[in-house]
A protein has these predicted regions:
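Short Cys/His-centered divalent metal-binding micro-motifs
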Residues: 62, 100-129
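Cys/His-rich microdomains that often coordinate metals
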Residues: 61-74, 117
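Short intrinsically disordered terminal tails
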Residues: 1, 130-132
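Residues that flank catalytic or metal-binding motifs in active/ligand-binding sites
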Residues: 50, 73-76, 106
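Short, charged surface segments at domain edges that flank catalytic/cofactor-binding sites
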Residues: 2-64, 92-104
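Histidine-centered catalytic micro-motifs used for acid/base chemistry in nuclease
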Residues: 73-91
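Intrinsic structural disorder/low-complexity segments
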Residues: 49, 82, 117-120, 131
Length: 132
């Protein structure tokens, strides 16, 4: 019977495997800000200064909204096909390929629509995990 592999020490044994994966994912998310198809998607959805057309609802969404004393981001560029599928984590190659996709897999959503879509996807993953 094969032994369970022992996790490799990361960052001089200061990080667990989960911390390492979280770090890499965050660095990849940062890199997507410079990905041209994301900028192109935003440009095409722009109606006028500070307003974008939400793909999920008929509203013209402002770039930011004021909540109390804070300004919050109100626009997100969303992947139409989720980065992490319903079945869960597949691997780094799939993750990177999905994250750095072309414009036809991207849409601009207001915060309300993005939160609804994200919650729905998370719910589907949760149901799938319970059934397996």
């Amino acid at each position: 019977m094969a032994r369970k592999p022992i996790p490799r020490p990361r960052c001089g044994s200061r990080w667990t495997e989960a911390q390492y994966q979280s770090f890499v994912k965050n660095q990849l998310r940062s890199a997507t800000r410079k990905w041209a198809p994301i900028s192109d998607c935003l440009k095409k959805a722009r109606l006028r200064r500070g307003f974008y057309k939400c793909a999920g609802c008929p509203k013209d969404a402002p770039t930011s909204i004021k909540v109390g004393n804070k300004r919050m981001k109100n626009i997100s560029v969303d992947h139409i096909k989720p980065i992490v599928p319903v079945t869960g984590w597949v691997g780094w190659d799939h993750y990177i390929e999905s994250m750095f996709c072309e414009e036809e897999n991207l849409q601009v959503l207001c915060k309300v629509c993005h939160d609804k879509k994200s919650a729905g996807e998370a719910g589907q993953r949760k149901i799938h995990r319970r059934s397996t």
